[in-house]
Amino acid sequence: MPNKSSATSMRSGHIAPVVLTILDGWGHREENINNAINNADTPVMDALWQAYPHTLIEASGADVGLPDNQMGNSEVGHLTIGAGRIIQQELVRISNTIRSKKLDQITNLSNLANKLIETDKTLHLVGLCSDGGVHSHINHLCGLLEWAKNKGIQKVAVHAFTDGRDTPAKSSLQYLKIIKEKFEVLGIGELATLCGRYWSMDRDNRWERIEKAYELLTNPNYPLSELSSDEIITNSYDSSITDEFLEPIRLTPSYLKDGDGLIMFNFRPDRARQLIKSITLPSFSEFKRKYQPQLNVVTLTQYEMDLPVSVVFPPESLDNLLGQVISEHGLLQYRTAETEKYPHVTYFFNGGIEQPLPGEKRHLVPSPRVATYDLSPEMSAEKLTKSCQEAIESGIYSLIVINYANPDMVGHTGIHAATKKAISTVDKCIGKILDSTGKMSGTLLITADHGNAELMKGPDGEPWTAHTTNPVPVILIEGEKRKISGQGNQIRLREGGGLADIAPTLLEVLSLPKPDAMTGSSLIETIQTNSKTNLVQQHV
């Protein structure tokens, strides 16, 4: 029987919920220039920042288990928020293995190498080629090329997805140069195809995009380009097509054939799943596959359970996460987001667990079907807000988690005017969430998972489409039934925190114990005001 807490005492009437509102990509930067957040009309957030306890916390680098100065991202951010601790991320885990020359010791990689050598087949290395560090890292590709050379694999083809989203929009030439230089040093490898990530890394069930990438990789009759990779990219720039949207191009006769090996070196699952499903699942039916090569497929990480692939770095199990604590105390929780961020408030927030927890209700709001979100900067925020208000006012949920995708998804387009509109849309929605939470005497905690929209141009004056390393805001609006402050004291939020401190803060508001595994600490400090000298007590 789960332990009950004082939080359940409200079951006799309506529960006063704690509402965690995550503003995806809403970072903090003091400068106003090229800052879509500061330049937007945000009366609600401005008023809340002035009137309620607030602070800035770190959401990048070592504070979320990434290398120093590595920008945060949605997967890492939601995982850290949900876990209440800093977790070594896959980027670091894989990089450490490559740096210490331990790829040779991984059994499934050795098995693949032996099979390819015995059958004289080709190894295809497929993935995003940049140093963005969000979905992949070019150092991992270089490490795999060195591993292939050491193992004696002679035929190696690289299928490069160009970035321009987690990196500057026109930066792919520098990464292709690194790859080509690696080929020359090692004496193996060829650049077989190029494809913008827009086509190969969709996560919104735009299967017509994935189909184009699939055809590029599998069709033996796909036309070969007569131009070099550099010429193709330069011509694309001249036509105002940046790296993210580069049309699929085949450079050499190498394509996926029966018996070949494939290593997909993206480590983040959400934008790798759809393509790998189309390549590996016999029952796949989202589009007609004329060619279905039988391959030996390896992925660096687990993209989804039960895929017919071998995984190099299986997930490390996590327990005592925020969602689990809520569930184990017999309380109900509600998670909602639109399509683009739905996995983040569910799968990632729960530490990589697909299935809902006992008492966890999930609600998906479809994202608009547009080519890029600058065409619809409001996205589905209004529908999302309405569904969340209904959950808040139902009076049955103790914890509600909502993600607003607009600052991040529109920020990624690099279009300042559209991003300002996205920010203003979210600001209005926060006002509605605040009203509903207030009706229920609940508590609202507003934060973000990483920065983005606060920087719209880079130092070179080009659009900045990537995330940032800037801190993110936290605002706590106490409800009457969830007050920590009271007679003779008030609260403030301490400085020096990170995303790992959000879960402990929420547990304190919910009057639930913090598990030992949660090494984060509550951001709440109580200021005793009933004496001449204020006494600050940190809640840990």
Curated annotation (Swiss-Prot):
Function comment: Catalyzes the interconversion of 2-phosphoglycerate and 3-phosphoglycerate.
Highest taxon listed in the record's lineage: Bacteria
PANTHER family membership: 2,3-BISPHOSPHOGLYCERATE-INDEPENDENT PHOSPHOGLYCERATE MUTASE
Top-level EC class: isomerase
Binding site for Mn(2+) 1: 408, 412, 467
GO molecular function, one term: phosphoglycerate mutase activity
UniProt keyword annotation of Isomerase present: yes
EC number(s) per entry: 5.4.2.12
GO BP terms, alphabetized: glucose catabolic process; glycolytic process
Transmembrane segments: none
Entries under Pfam families matching the protein: iPGM_N, Metalloenzyme
Catalytic activity: (2R)-2-phosphoglycerate = (2R)-3-phosphoglycerate
Protein name: 2,3-bisphosphoglycerate-independent phosphoglycerate mutase
Cofactor: Mn(2+)
Key words, A-Z: Glycolysis, Isomerase, Manganese, Metal-binding
Coiled-coil intervals: none
Binding site for substrate: 135, 165-166, 197, 203, 268-271, 341
